[in-house]
């Protein structure tokens, strides 16, 4: 039983949703964006500020549709038709870090000479300020105010010809907090969860 004199922040006692973000991934399935769309419907209660889907097709082309609002406000038959491919990641946003705005709506899509990839994140990185300072010192330029973008910069900061999975593991070892990440490349879908089991 919770009472108003419990040691909980006041916002726990209002009627608003208190869950934060949701990620959904599909790999190797025909019409992946359709499944991702229905996955977002199932996760809609976890975030209502914005949502997005990134899909990759057989030609290694990444397509993205994202926007601010509910799933049914952002997606329609016409824009879902543009998301062709057999792999996709999707995200619903409830901001815990960074402000509002379309630049913070995920999944993020990153273009790089070693290969493009998309990233979706649920959670909160408690060492985000330190990581942002470190990455800025190394020359990173950020496109959002979301802590989620940090992982992409960490993955690409010291490529040194290593396989992407090694870069991902190295990057994950640098972050602290609660998280679930989906990273979609043209060949693989990587999933990572914090050691506490968010």
List the predicted regions and their residue ranges.
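Conserved short alpha-helical segments that host acidic/polar catalytic motifs at enzyme active sites
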Residues: 2-198
């Amino acid at each position: 039983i919770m009472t108003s004199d419990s040691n909980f922040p006041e916002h726990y006692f209002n009627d608003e949703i208190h869950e934060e973000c949701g990620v959904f991934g599909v790999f190797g399935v025909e019409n992946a964006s359709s499944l991702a769309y229905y996955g977002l419907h199932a996760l809609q209660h976890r975030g209502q500020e914005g949502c997005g889907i990134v899909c990759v097709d057989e030609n290694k082309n990444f397509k993205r549709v994202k926007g601010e609002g509910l799933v049914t406000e952002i997606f329609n038959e016409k824009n879902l038709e543009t998301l062709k491919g057999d792999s996709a990641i999707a995200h619903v946003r409830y901001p815990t870090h960074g402000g509002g705005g379309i630049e913070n709506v995920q999944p993020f899509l990153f273009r790089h000479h070693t290969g493009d990839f998309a990233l979706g994140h649920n959670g909160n990185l408690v060492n985000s300020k330190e990581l942002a300072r470190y990455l800025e010192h190394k020359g990173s330029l950020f496109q959002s105010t979301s802590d989620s973008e940090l992982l992409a910069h960490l993955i690409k900061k010291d490529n040194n010809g290593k396989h992407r999975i090694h870069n991902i593991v190295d990057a994950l070892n640098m972050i602290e907090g609660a998280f679930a990440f989906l990273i979609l490349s043209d060949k693989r879908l990587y999933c990572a969860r914090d050691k506490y089991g968010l």
